[in-house]
UniProtKB/Swiss-Prot annotation, chain C:
NDH-1 is composed of 14 different subunits. Subunits NuoA, H, J, K, L, M, N constitute the membrane sector of the complex. It is a multi-pass membrane protein. GO terms for molecular function: NADH:ubiquinone reductase (non-electrogenic) activity; quinone binding. This is NADH-quinone oxidoreductase subunit K. The chain crosses the membrane at residues 1-21, 27-47, 58-78.
Curated annotation (Swiss-Prot), chain E:
This is NADH-quinone oxidoreductase subunit N. Residues 494-520 are annotated as: Disordered. It comes from Gemmatimonas aurantiaca (strain DSM 14586 / JCM 11422 / NBRC 100505 / T-27). The chain crosses the membrane at residues 13-33, 55-75, 87-107, 115-135, 141-161, 176-196, 219-239, 250-270, 285-305, 313-333, 339-359, 383-403, 425-445, 468-488. The keyword Transport applies. Keywords: Cell inner membrane, Cell membrane, Membrane, NAD, Quinone, Translocase, Transmembrane, Transmembrane helix, Transport, Ubiquinone.
Length: 521, 418, 97, 134, 520
């Protein structure tokens, strides 16, 4: 039915452009609630900017559903693909399309952002039109990163995320966060600008006629050139996704950011980009023994280190951040082990981490709304006071620590299985990280929920409102549903990960010494 | 070279005699006798002056620039003595060694040489004024420099038409051209007049002797000088006067050329020709020297602002416009097929007559020719009074006496004032 | 002859550069700059003996420019003097980073 | 080249020598007998007040600047004036005469442009009052 | 004896310049009949500056039209090849006129506040841009010198044009002295080149150099001195020391003019001399220019980091931009040149816009705005803050939100990496430097958005003209940032359409191959 409307022709461009358009509308037409509250000014006309933003994001989510709908599970290659002529002189087209890898990301993003906004409705109450506009721009960038097939368009989308995030964190974040957000931008920028050089070099090597990934995948490169380009790409993505040791900006930025921004920072955009671009474009470099083992070791270190550091945190938000760092390690591990299971596991982990992190940050935000702090020392015994909250927190935390039956388990399990087949030692070490994860997860739950109510203020905290309940129930339902029925994603990611591995093995740049990967499982 | 020594000697003698001539002329104009003690008819007066100057004590005012004070007279003296070297004095002289140009240094860029060297003289005056540490002297030096540079432009521009006709900067060629076409004073009357006025100003002679206006500045830049140093300034001034006269003669009155005949211009050259042309040249030059002195004892001195405004707002535009007119006219005559000859000159003369008429009626309007007082109509008098009133009011305003004090004149940097 | 002129020109230019580097008086700096230009003029004239009239034309143009520059420089230095009462550049301190 | 200017150089040397001689002789023949009163600058008998080298009217600077600018215009006009006839002829001249019908307005046009620019500057200076001395 | 050079050909070749200078002189005459100072009617006289500035803008548009027509006609340069008639000249002319028009608007805006400018300032600006246009077309060292001086003399005056301001006077004297000295170097270089080659025409110089087995020391020292002089003019490190002081002291519109348009013209002539004239000697100057570019990028960005004074910051940033542009000259082929043109378009728009904002927040005070002045701008004038962010991001080279700035860097990087001898290291230096530059540009952004408005800071107000300038610049940057093809098409045409008089001896690109055999 959807196909008959030709929806696949316009849905992806719409997903990319609608938020930008909506951003302008929200900025111009939205009403700033805080001004009404302060009574400084006569309420300007128009609806509440937050409502407008949410509506726009809801439209975006609907579009994502449409994409999901038109996606052919058995199809090969790009789906819902659209090519819009753009810069003829560079050979750049606005080429959009999804496959099994990006589809989950698109849907995840399109749902998580509005939920996060709804869940942190009162987190931001000042200058909401601008806030909404920036959030929409950011959404456009996020979606763009997942659906663009042209490297120039991808780079534009990639950088489009930067400034809105910077402003969201800096302006609406806790006081004195401009430094943290600046650090985030600078870190990211160094990486992405190096990537820009690599993109141009790659394009140049491909004859300077096209920036489309399909074209560039066919470009044969010298090992040396591959290595440099891969390192440039990897630098950009690793910084963005906060791989240890490039992770230092993440906890600072996330803990300072307004909830929505923290959620978007937690989305594993970089990890996706590594799977999508860095590995298939430069397989020989990625599978080079030194490079690969270094990254694998780094990943494992990230898993363990993230978990260990998370254990030592005294602030709930920072625990979430470090757990996210730890997850990223697993995703990287899965990506670079590059077996069908591990890649699928990585995809699952990206999704699970996205959902769980969102849920946790929303919960932290709810705490913060109520008590203006998220330090463990301020809380305790909330289980009795806030039952809804507690349930949501426990489920989310269990998913984070990969309890079977939650989505988190699926991802980690697949990654670890895949890794075990290739690198048993690494798998074992990484598994220890999972155990540490249990420790920090339980510790957080215990410190927040189960000790005595030792602070007067905590006794009278209101439980989740209807709005908050709706958001948390949705997220928890997603975690549990995907935990028991991961098929919905795995089925779609299967072909894509196969294709990825094939392109690595048989592409023009395939490594001469193949990694010991068994295709038949 | 012999030529240098001979001509230099003659030159110095002429200068010396000129001081006497000037005084004699002044006496004549004023109906008195002039110097008559030293020698017969005062003929040895210059010698007496010279000896006196050598013996006279020199004062050394407590100035900061002792060396500049000493060098300044030399700086005025040297260029004055150099300029005349390029002026052709007569038709070439046949000698056993071939034809010899009757100029000390017959350089091909004679005209430029005169312009260049004569403008160096201003350094002497400025430095004299500066190093004297005397307010009169400083002001005199400044005035002379401002005046000389102002009129140098008018002078330069007024000679361009000559170049237009001659097509060369060699003074000899200019003389030759006039021999062929007739004197430039006919074809370029206005240029001649502007040149003459500028020449007066350049030599700091009355009516433009503001730098040494004795009624205002005692003696101007050489107030503090005495003895031979003073004498050197004096020599320089007279030397310049001769040079300028000779230049006028050369550029506008045919130089050593004899009018109405080609006899003197064509080979073979003989000693007789040289002598005759030399005399012709000397007569022409002498006439202009006479004019210089005549004017000195006839006309009153200009006011300084009148002087500057004459130079900048009348001489310069007139000279500029004249260049354009002559350029157009000569091109037009060429287009009409008039060959360069007497007819050409006549045509230009006609043009000049028209131009002079225009100049006198339209441009002058009673400013130059007749004294303003003779022409002021009652209504104009009223206007002038009102203007004077306005000026004094403004002056008061500037002093802050009147409330509506306006700013200093914007647009140009105005500071101090004297 | 040309070589000598070039050497003189180079020396004059060098004097100008050294003056520019070592002096702080605006007038002297200005004079040094003019000296540099005129040193170059000398070079041009010398080279013109080899290569024809182009150098002379260039010299006239440089002179023009130098004249305009001189007029301008004088005006600017006067302005400086009016504002600061000095032409010593090291006393000019309104612009500090 | 050098031969043409040799007389000038000789004359220059001669004149400089003369100047030095005059200054030197007069320096030797006289005996300075300075007294304090004799040494003070002559200002019509009034004791001088302050240094002579005070600030003087900016007008003098202005004239200097204008001179520099306008004098250079003359520098351009001289070569133009000298070559005017050649510039007015579209083909090389024959015996100093331009062949009939070959007159060109190139030289005149160039100079008119030049003069026009000069006049604009002149009018500007004039209207700004830089030429009036008050 | 006007041999072969008919007056008509000269007229045709120089028509835009003549139009512009003629118009400028008319404006000058108009300005002189404006009462000022203590003359009666001086109050209306102040108005006149604004009127004249607007006329200047119109004049720029007219001349721009003439340029477009000339380009469309395929107008050639002068027959003797001393003035180019190629696309590069016309394109640079257009950029210069754009910058001049915008600067005139800025002038008008600033004048509304401070009344600091006399009525002749617009015509000064136009005369400066006449000089720049001469530079854009100069194919003869004589014209180069003439253009440089025509431009510089007017800009010296412009720097000191606020006569009430001591800062302005100081800027003028510093600019003047350094400018005069750099002219000296430039000229000496020209003299030595003339001495070595016997001509001042770039074409002759190229032919001479191509015919030599070894290049004489005279020639090379000429090139070196020329390089130094040009480096002074474009403010490349280490010859940049005058820049911050001069930019700081000069009136804001003039600073904008200097940092965008003057730089454009200087780079145009730099490129023409280096690429067209001295390409044969490329192996010899290449290394020097390489280091110049690298050092300039680093120095500009590093020194900008510590500035609180926004104008000084932009001054250092303009030094850094000079470094980026030098990269395109080092690349030296058609791609590099078109990248240069694209870059200056983007840079002009961003600079003019940014200075428009600075003029607005400065409110006519006689001092440079600092970070404190712009702090919390977002709270009072959100759109202004957004526009400023766009401009800063364009400087930085951020895609989408920085608009054209990104593609400007992209094209330079592309040219650098595509060149026959790829400049990979310079490209990396460039991007790292850009990343560093983000620190200070974002410091301004963060001041605007993340700091409270200081007490007592007045709410800036704009004139409609300035407002439209800022808006236009920002929108143009954004639009062409998503679809840069028109501008790039223009830039590309500029470097591929050559006039009949273009140098056949040195087609671009092949030059390098020829010189590869030149022994060092």
């Amino acid at each position: 039915m959807l196909l008959s409307l030709g929806i696949d022709r316009w849905v992806l461009p719409a997903m990319l452009l609608w938020p930008v358009l909506a951003a302008v509308l929200v900025r111009i037409g939205g009403r700033d609630v805080s001004r009404d509250d302060a009574g400084n000014e006569a309420p300007s006309g128009g609806p509440d900017a937050r409502v407008l933003t949410l509506a726009a994001l809801a439209v975006e989510a609907l579009l994502a559903v449409a994409v999901w709908g038109v996606f052919d599970v058995d199809g090969r290659g790009w789906q819902a693909r659209v090519d819009i002529p753009w810069l003829a002189d560079l050979g750049a087209t606005l080429s959009l399309g999804v496959d099994g890898l990006s589809l989950p990301m698109v849907v995840l993003t399109a749902f998580v952002v509005p939920l996060a906004l709804l869940g942190s409705w009162n987190n931001v109450r000042v200058r909401t039109p601008a806030f909404g506009a920036l959030l929409l721009l950011l959404t456009s960038g996020l979606v763009g990163v997942f659906i663009t097939l042209d490297l120039l368009a991808f780079y534009l989308a990639w950088e489009l995320m930067l400034i809105p995030t910077y402003l969201l964190v800096g302006v609406w974040g806790a006081a004195g966060t401009s430094r943290a957000s600046l650090r985030y931008v600078l870190f990211t920028l160094v990486g992405s600008l190096l990537m820009l050089v690599a993109i141009i070099a790659l394009w140049n090597a491909g004859g300077g006629t096209s920036l489309h990934i399909d074209h560039l995948l066919q470009v044969a490169l010298s090992p040396r050139a591959q290595l440099w380009m891969f390192l440039a790409f990897f630098a950009a993505f690793a910084v963005k996704s906060a791989l240890v040791p490039f992770h230092t900006w993440l906890p600072d930025a996330q803990s300072a950011a307004p909830t929505v921004a923290a959620v978007t920072l937690g989305l594993k955009v970089g990890a996706y980009a590594i799977l999508r671009f860095a590995i298939p474009l430069f397989p020989a470099a990625a599978m080079d023994y030194t490079v690969r083992s270094t990254i694998l070791v780094l990943s494992v270190i990230a898993v363990v280190y993230g978990a260990l550091v998370a254990m030592a945190q005294r602030d709930f938000k920072r625990v979430i951040s470090y757990s996210s760092v730890s997850h990223l390690g697993l995703i990287m591990l899965g990506s670079f082990v590059l077996t069908p299971q591990s890649v699928q596991g990585a995809v699952m982990s990206i999704v699970s981490s996205g959902i769980a992190t969102t849920a946790l940050f929303l919960l932290a935000g709810m705490l913060e709304d109520r008590r203006a702090t998220t330090a463990f020392s301020a809380f305790g015994g909330l289980a009795k006071v806030l039952p809804w909250f507690s349930v949501a927190l426990i489920v989310s935390m269990l998913s984070t620590v990969a309890l079977p039956g939650t989505i988190g388990f699926v991802g980690e399990f697949l990654v670890l299985i895949g890794t075990y087949a290739e690198f048993p030692v690494l798998a074992v070490i990484a598994t220890s990280g999972v155990i540490f994860a249990a420790v920090y997860g339980l510790r957080a739950v215990q410190q927040l929920l189960f000790e005595k109510v030792d602070t007067e203020a905590n006794g009278a905290l209101p439980d989740l409102s209807g709005r908050e309940r709706f958001v948390m129930v949705t997220l928890v339902a997603a975690m549990v549903y995907l935990g028991v029925a991961p098929h919905a994603i795995l089925q779609r990611a299967d072909r894509a990960s196969q294709a990825l591995i094939e392109s690595v093995r048989f592409g023009p740049n395939a490594p001469t010494t193949l990694p010991p990967v068994s295709l038949s499982r | 070279m012999v030529k240098i020594l001979v001509v230099f000697g003659v030159w110095m003698l002429t200068v010396a005699m000129l001081t006497l001539v000037e005084r004699k002329l002044a006496a004549w104009f004023q109906d008195r006798r002039g110097p008559n003690r030293a020698g017969p008819g005062g003929i040895l007066q210059p010698v007496a002056d010279g000896i006196k100057n050598f013996m006279k004590e020199e004062t050394n005012p407590p100035f900061a620039d002792r060396w500049l004070f000493i060098i300044a007279p030399a700086l005025a003296f040297i260029p004055a003595m150099l300029t005349w070297a390029v002026i052709p004095l007569a038709a070439p002289l046949p000698t056993p060694w071939g034809l010899i140009d009757m100029a000390v240094a017959p350089v091909p860029v004679g005209f430029l040489f005169v312009l260049a060297i004569s403008s160096l003289g201003v350094y002497g005056m400025v430095l004299a004024g500066w190093s004297s540490n005397n307010k009169y002297a400083l002001l005199g030096g400044l005035r002379s420099s401002a005046q000389m540079v102002s009129y140098e432009i008018a002078m330069g521009m007024s000679t361009i038409p000559v170049l237009l006709l001659a097509g060369n900067v060699s003074l000899n060629t200019i003389v030759q051209q006039q021999a062929g076409m007739g004197w430039n004073v006919f074809s370029l009357t206005i240029a001649w007049f502007t040149f003459l006025v500028a020449a007066f100003a350049e030599t700091n002679r009355l009516p433009f002797d503001l730098p040494e206006a004795e009624s205002e500045l005692v003696a101007g830049y050489h107030t503090e000088y005495s003895g031979m140093k003073f004498s050197m300034f004096f020599i320089a001034e007279y030397s310049n006067m001769i040079t300028v006269s000779a230049l006028t003669a050369t550029m506008f009155f045919g130089g050593w050329d004899l009018p109405f005949t080609q006899w003197d211009n064509v080979a073979p050259f003989t000693v007789l020709k040289t002598l005759v042309t030399l005399i012709a040249f000397a007569l022409k030059t002498g006439f202009f020297i006479f004019v210089f002195m005549w004017v000195r004892w006839t006309l009153p001195r200009f006011r300084y602002d009148q002087l500057m405004s004459l130079g900048w707002s009348i001489m310069l535009p007139v000279a500029l416009a004249y260049i354009v007119i002559i350029a157009v006219a000569s091109l037009g005559l060429d287009a009409l097929g008039v060959t360069r000859g007497p007819l050409f000159t006549l045509a230009l003369l006609g043009l000049n007559v028209v131009l002079i008429a225009i100049l006198l009626t339209w441009l002058d309007r009673g400013k130059l020719i007749s004294p303003a007082s003779a022409r002021v109509a009652p209504t104009d008098l009223e206007r002038l009074r009102a203007r004077g009133l306005d000026l004094s009011r403004r002056k008061l305003a500037a002093q802050g006496v009147l409330p509506d004090a306006a700013n200093t004149a914007a647009g140009v940097i105005s500071e101090g004032g004297n | 002859m040309i070589t000598e002129a070039l050497i003189v020109s180079a020396i004059l230019f060098a004097i100008g550069v050294v003056g520019v580097l070592t002096r702080r008086n605006a007038i002297i700096l200005f004079m040094c700059a003019e000296l540099m230009l005129n040193a170059v003029n000398l070079s041009f004239v010398a080279f013109s003996r080899l290569h024809g009239v182009t150098g002379h034309v260039f010299v006239i143009m440089v002179m023009t420019v130098a004249a305009a520059e001189a007029a301008l420089g004088l005006a600017i230095v006067i302005a400086i003097y009016r504002h600061f009462g000095t032409v010593d550049l090291s006393n000019l301190r309104t612009l500090r980073g | 080249m050098l031969r043409t200017f040799l007389p000038v150089l000789l004359l220059l040397g001669f004149v400089v020598l003369n100047a030095v001689l005059i200054l030197g002789i007069s320096h030797m023949t006289i005996k300075a007998q300075p007294t304090p009163v004799k040494s003070i600058p002559y200002e019509s008998g009034i004791t001088p007040l302050g240094d002579a080298r005070e600030r003087f009217s900016v007008k003098f600077y202005l004239v200097a600047m204008l001179f520099i600018v306008f004098d250079i215009e003359t520098v351009f006009m001289i070569p133009w004036g000298v070559y005017y006839r050649q510039l007015s002829c579209a083909v090389p001249m024959v015996n100093g005469v331009c062949p009939a019908g070959q007159l060109s307005f190139f030289g005149l046009g160039e100079m008119l442009v030049f003069v026009a620019i000069l006049v604009v500057g002149f009018v500007y200076v004039w209207k700004k009052g830089a030429l009036t001395w008050d | 004896m006007p041999d072969a050079m008919s007056a008509g050909a000269i007229l045709r070749a120089l028509l835009p310049e003549m139009l512009l200078s003629g118009g400028a002189m008319l404006l000058l005459l108009a300005s002189v009949w404006t009462p000022q100072g203590n003359q009666p009617g001086a109050a209306e006289g102040a108005e006149r500056t604004s009127v004249l500035a607007r006329f200047g803008v119109i004049l720029c548009l007219v001349v721009g039209l003439a340029v477009v027509i000339a380009w469309g006609d395929g107008a050639a340069g002068t027959p003797d090849g001393r003035v180019a008639g190629d696309g590069f000249r016309w394109a640079v002319d257009l950029v210069i006129l754009l910058g001049t028009a915008l600067a005139l608007m800025l002038l008008e805006a600033e004048h509304q506040r401070s009344a600091a400018f006399g009525p002749e300032v617009p015509s000064l600006m136009l005369l400066a841009s006449t000089g720049m246009m001469v530079l854009a077309g100069a194919r003869d060292l004589m014209f180069v010198f003439l253009g440089v001086e025509l431009m510089s003399l007017a800009v010296y005056v412009l720097a000191g044009v606020n006569r009430r301001s001591a800062r302005s006077a100081e800027a003028a004297v510093k600019y003047f002295l350094l400018g005069a000295i750099s002219s000296g170097f430039l000229l000496y270089g020209m003299a030595l080149l003339f001495g070595a080659t016997g001509s001042t025409r770039l074409q002759d110089i190229t032919e001479w150099a191509a015919a030599q087995a070894t290049l004489s020391p005279l020639f090379m020292s000429g090139v070196a001195l020329l390089l130094v002089g040009l480096a002074f003019k474009v403010a490349a490190a280490p010859f940049h020391l005058w820049t911050p002081d001069v930019y700081d002291g000069a009136p804001l519109p003039v600073t904008a003019f200097m940092s965008a348009t003057v730089k454009t013209a200087a780079f145009a002539v730099f490129a023409r001399i280096m690429i067209e004239g001295l390409a044969v000697a490329a192996p010899r100057w290449h290394m020097g220019l390489w280091w110049l570019a690298a050092v300039t990028m680093v120095v500009g960005n590093v020194f900008a980091l510590s500035q609180r004074n926004l104008v000084r910051m932009l001054a250092y940033s303009s030094i850094a931009h000079a470094g980026y542009l030098l990269v395109s000259i080092i690349v030296g082929d058609a791609a590099g040149t078109s990248a240069l043109i694209f870059y200056v378009v983007s840079y002009t728009l961003a600079t003019m816009g940014a200075f428009g904002v600075l003029i607005t927040i400065n409110g006519g005070r006689d001092r440079a705005p600092t970070l404190d002045d712009i702090a919390g701008l977002w709270l009072v004038r959100p759109w202004l803050a957004i526009a400023m962010t766009v401009f800063l991001l364009a400087f930085m080279g951020m895609p989408v939100l920085g608009g054209m700035g990104f593609f400007a860097k992209w094209y330079i990087l592309q040219a650098a990496l595509q060149a026959p001898a790829p400049q990979t290291i310079l490209a990396v230096v460039l991007v790292i430097a850009s990343a560093v530059s983000a620190a200070y540009y974002l410091a301004v952004v963060s001041a605007m958005f993340m700091r409270p408005r200081p007490e007592g800071q007045p709410v800036p107000s704009t004139t409609p003209l300035n407002q439209s300038l800022i808006a236009t610049a920002a929108v143009a940057l954004l639009v062409f940032g998503l679809y840069p093809t028109p501008i790039m098409e223009l830039a590309r045409r500029a470097t591929t359409t050559t006039s009949p008089t273009s140098n056949p001896a040195a087609p671009r690109g092949e030059v390098r191959l020829q010189t590869a055999s030149v022994p060092r």
